[in-house]
Amino acid sequence: MPVRAQRIQHVMQDTIINFYSTSDDYGDFSNFAAWPIKVDGKTWPTSEHYFQAQKFLDEKYREEIRRVSSPMVAARMGRNRSKPLRKNWESVKEQVMRKALRAKFEQHAELRVLLLATAPAKLVEHTENDAYWGDGGNGKGKNRLGYLLMELREQLAIEK
């Protein structure tokens, strides 16, 4: 690799790409971004709709979530504790998110290109609203969404 390319790659490794709002430069990485996904024969308006619905075993309630008008409403419905959560939710939630992300980035070529173009930068869901999927706003959160996107980016680069 030429020296200049090595320097550019080194700079990119130190680069952090923050995303959260769908209006951000990388807002399409948000689960609220309006990129429909088809999973298990059903079309979901956003990956957020799909993710939130998978918390529940009640098929009727899952369908209600799928049909709501916005990812914000889907997220609110996903926090509804009057409906029982799947007992194994904590152990499967990352697997569900992986499935949603893979569908989103495989089914939309322009998103796949955008994700691949971020390598090797660190992707961070920068929000104080979530310290599990995001960075907690102060960098101390787990940033699991960012890490799952980087994992997917690596897989897609290999499959290219």
From Swiss-Prot:
GO terms for molecular function: hydrolase activity, acting on glycosyl bonds. Its EC number is 3.2.2.-. InterPro entries: NADAR (IPR012816), YbiA-like_sf (IPR037238). Pfam families: NADAR (PF08719). Gene3D superfamilies: YbiA-like. The keyword Hydrolase applies. Keywords: Glycosidase, Hydrolase. It is an enzyme of class 3 (hydrolase). Belongs to the YbiA family. This is N-glycosidase YbiA. The gene is ybiA.
